[in-house]
Amino acid sequence: MANISSPFGQNEWLVEEMYRKFRDDPSSVDPSWHEFLVDYNPESTAEPVLTDPTSTDKQPSATPQAKPAAAADPVASRAKPATTPTVANGTAAGSAAAPAKTTTTPPIEGDELQVLRGAAAVVVKNMSASLDVPTATSVRAVPAKLMIDNRTVINNQLKRNRGGKISFTHLLGYALVQAVKKFPNINRHYAEIDGKPIAVTPAHTNLGLAIDLQGKDGKRSLVVAGIKRCEELRFAQFVTAYEDIVRRARDGKLTAEDFAGVTISLTNPGTIGTVHSVPRLMTGQGAIIGVGAMEYPAEFQGASAERIAELGIGKLITLTSTYDHRIIQGAESGDFLRTIHEMVLSDSFWDEIFRELSIPYLPVRWRTDNPDSIVDKNARVMELIAAYRNRGHLMADIDPLRLDNTRFRSHPDLDLLTHGLTLWDLDRVFKVNGFGGWKYKKLRDVLGLLRDAYCRHIGVEYTHILDPEQQEWLQQRVETKNVKPTVAEQKYILSKLNAAEAFETFLHTKYVGQKRFSLEGAESVIPMMDAAIDQCAKHGLDEVVIGMPHRGRLNVLANIVGKPYSQIFTEFEGNLNPTLAHSSGDVKYHLGATGLYLQMFGDNDIQVSLTANPSHLEAVDPVLEGLVRAKQDLLNKDTNGNQDEAFSVVPMMLHGDAAFAGQGVVAETLNLANLPGYRVGGTIHIIVNNQIGFTTAPEYSRSSEYCTDVAKMIGAPIFHVNGDDPEACVWVAKLAVDFRQRFKKDVVIDMLCYRRRGHNEGDDPSMTNPYMYDVVDTKRGARKSYTEALIGRGDISLKEAEDALRDYQGQLERVFNEVRDLEKHGVQPSESVESDQMIPAGLSTAVDKALLARIGDAFLAVPEGFTVHPRVQPVLEKRREMAYEGKIDWAFAELLALGSLVAEGKLVRLSGQDTKRGTFSQRHSVIIDRHTGEEFTPLQLLANNPDGSPTGGKFLVYNSPLSEYAAVGFEYGYTVGNPDAVVLWEAQFGDFVNGAQSIIDEFINSGEAKWGQLSTVVLLLPHGHEGQGPDHTSGRIERFLQLWAEGSMTFAVPSTPSNYFHLLRRHALDGIKRPLIVFTPKSMLRNKAAVSDIKDFTEIKFRSVLEEPTYEDSIDDRSKVTRVLLTCGKLYYELAARKIKDNRDDVAIVRIEQLAPLPRRRLGETLDRYENAKEFFWVQEEPANQGAWPRFGLELPELLPRLTGIKRISRRAMSAPSSGSSKVHAVEQQEILDTAFG
């Protein structure tokens, strides 16, 4: 028989069984055993040689030195004595193996005799041999409650994510290995070399696991396989090695190496209920650790669960250490068990394990029970519930990268200990006042629901909301068991992920190096957006309008809006759509589109559109809001005051994390959310949180905890969600839409994800963010991880997943081939926009006197009982007088223009800071009751004809928030959504319009050229030098003229009320869809010379060039004129007054009322009337480097040869628009007049 001191110990039976199989049929044994078995002899008496640890001759100890021999009858065989033994493990040196003995009790007739073979025979031998090892056993009872609770936390987290389970043996085995590091003697074993006793300390800890196997015949057997070099393994690696050994044991794939070299063993008889066991110690080992069953102390096993919880009784687990007393002493063994005991109760042990398993939560802590009364603890449980509602998001597992894996997601307010609660309270019942639908509940269940609601893959912030109803609604939706999507819904989510990833992969493969700002790393936003749109369709809404930055835009165009792939790929191929040849165009990731969304699991459909945007991040935000408001106003569904119908167009806004926190226009736009003139019934905000802004990490780009904190200013609920969990993303999207529909408020979704590539496809992010991209480069994408989860749950098969992706890639490939075959259009230089748009022939902007009278009457038609402010009443009376008698001033001329348009069926929208009254108290478009504060809007009376029938027109006037960027963007967007509306925005002073410069540059001036996007927005910019300082002087004419080209806008500086009247009406009626910039007056508002007669409103039209009235009426003689002063705006009146004062009939003053497009023909005709003029001057108030001169000085001589040599009269060139001193201003102004007439 085989030597009982074999290195395989109690596994020897398995080795012998394999040998017999190998002998009969080598192919029946795993090839990894062949080398070992080819010269193995189960009857060899030679024992393995244990090399002196100090020897340099390394001999394998795992392979016995044996000679081939015939197998003997196992019943009659005897173990042969060793001839020259060199090692004796567990016996005296030089002793021979004892002969086999027979029982001293003879069998009784009828007894069944069975020869013990294989494992049973080896057990007999091993147990007999173990009697020669002088052992002792230490026993220690260890509290198991902390292990139970923390294991529950771990396994619940694993179940929600990648699957798998951690056993108590995993935990205790790892603790054993860590304890061995502190007590290396426990890992030693006894040997004799050359007759000398030796304590062998192995170089590594090789932990033997006793694995119970069941054979095909149903018989059970035990093998002990070793996890090698355990001391080098971290917990996750230890678990992997453990599971690998067990799996291969059960699959019959263990090798000889797995059995050899075990230094310490772990056995777990507790799995069959044994509480306390003293296992036998095999030769070659110094100790074996036994783990008993987890049980309550015997005296409490009859107690109820409630009583046990009340008393704070926990289960115990008994650990035994059976050790070789020759080399290990009892104190060492006892201290070893004590160390394991302390370790499994320590904070550091569990912190390490949780970090290793990427459990983002703090482990349960071992603490003594708090004896406070149950009444006091009821209050503390309610405090805990409130804390989770308020701070639970800080504990949520929302970061797919987990870059700082040493930091737990926690907060002191969420710690049981902070509230005077411990793990002993988890099974106690407390009063919870209806939380979760319960009146009373165990703290364990309460804590579980709180964590499921607020701390998993979704973190919710809502306690900053002031409305209790909204808070309660969110609690009811969040604090409930989440319903798992159906298999069909899961497959649909997977199909959207497949579509998103396949699209990016295809483009990356086919168009290497092209910038496309891919969505890779954030693919879950596609099923998220799809779910939100689907939910909008479910609510029966009309349209979802999307505004977003460039990252992921192509993917959204393809997979959300439904833009044809062939069109997208054609743009990549460099083909030019001939229908776009009139525009300069823009890069492919800025373009917009429109599509129709059909519900997958419903019968509704909904319009989906994506607005065009520039690269200026967040600039599209207010534009989107204005566009949506215009669409809502056009639908006009709030006629019955039903808000559910009024806001049937939904804005969906995508952001980047760095931009949302960093761009001020975000806060400006959020501030519009609940204002009457700007409200759209709630915006769905989705932040694609890449956790980086180009190369800047969050800690360098914001001061707040989250990038979303700015949204708290409007009481919007905020949902943080892990982008690696598409099901959570879909759930949050639906919840967000439901909240928006219920409360008509903004909702913010913060989807934490990552950016697979650099800022663009040519960027290497590892240069500046190496650690992040070390993580990103090895991270599996959302599609793969979700596919694995579905397959692991058995929802779909691997083949189904692969087939779905292959099919989608095949579709893209086919489209690509189609694009290759398309007829290519040669890319030609842009013909640009049509600069010379002709005003329709016969267009009349004059109105009937009766309409002027109606408008004048409206200002005195105040409701009965309405009290007009005593300072306003004269203004209203004067307006009625002007409507009948003339001498109409600027403010009333404007109201006449707007009122007449309302009467003609136009929607007129006027907004700006203080616009209802007017910055200079000139407008009074809305009258406020002196006593009640009620409003009366006279021009709204024009919405009905004299017979009471509606005209279809509407007058809307709003005081805007103190904003330029968002306010101008909103009004621009409104004109995109309703091109027929007359939309005017007025700056408080023209100087402040530069706060909206991005909107002017990117949308107003170039939107048509880039995207074919038309706008009729009107900007009213108070402008003029009046000694009020550099910030209350200039609307920056020079900047607008520098931007102007190709007829992109119309700029005008009207100098008479009637010309302003006709300018506004022409803009509204001529059909030309271009923005209008009007530089309006300030001091001229009350200039008695700046008035117009009624016939100027009823008989003429807008005149782009004006002569002095004395020449137009043939009072003065043009032939006397030798000097012509060209000017614009209110300076005309100062020049005219000086001319009269100096009696200069040799000087003529010509006003250019429209600066761009320059009225070249009309100006030329006007100048030709002054045949004797020799000198031409451009006279302006602005400094030489500002105003119209920088452009006119170059342009006028080119367009009109007669103006060659034209000279400038102005202030000197200045860095600021004007002097800060009114006295200096007066001197400069006088100098201009003196020079003009010098």
UniProtKB/Swiss-Prot annotation:
Residues 347-1238 are annotated as: 2-oxoglutarate dehydrogenase E1, C-terminal part. It catalyses: glyoxylate + 2-oxoglutarate + H(+) = 2-hydroxy-3-oxoadipate + CO2; 2-oxoglutarate + H(+) = succinate semialdehyde + CO2; N(6)-[(R)-lipoyl]-L-lysyl-[protein] + 2-oxoglutarate + H(+) = N(6)-[(R)-S(8)-succinyldihydrolipoyl]-L-lysyl-[protein] + CO2; N(6)-[(R)-dihydrolipoyl]-L-lysyl-[protein] + succinyl-CoA = N(6)-[(R)-S(8)-succinyldihydrolipoyl]-L-lysyl-[protein] + CoA. Residues 98-346 are annotated as: Succinyltransferase E2. 2-oxoglutarate binds at residues 590, 615, 1032. Belongs to the 2-oxoacid dehydrogenase family. Kgd subfamily. GO terms for molecular function: 2-hydroxy-3-oxoadipate synthase activity; 2-oxoglutarate decarboxylase activity; dihydrolipoyllysine-residue succinyltransferase activity; magnesium ion binding; oxoglutarate dehydrogenase (succinyl-transferring) activity; thiamine pyrophosphate binding. Homodimer. The 2-oxoglutarate dehydrogenase (ODH) complex contains multiple copies of three enzymatic components: 2-oxoglutarate dehydrogenase (E1), dihydrolipoamide succinyltransferase (E2) and lipoamide dehydrogenase (E3). Residues 42-97 are annotated as: Linker. Its EC number is 2.2.1.5, 4.1.1.71, 1.2.4.2, 2.3.1.61. The active site is at residue 325. This is Multifunctional 2-oxoglutarate metabolism enzyme. Mg(2+) binds at residues 657, 690, 692.
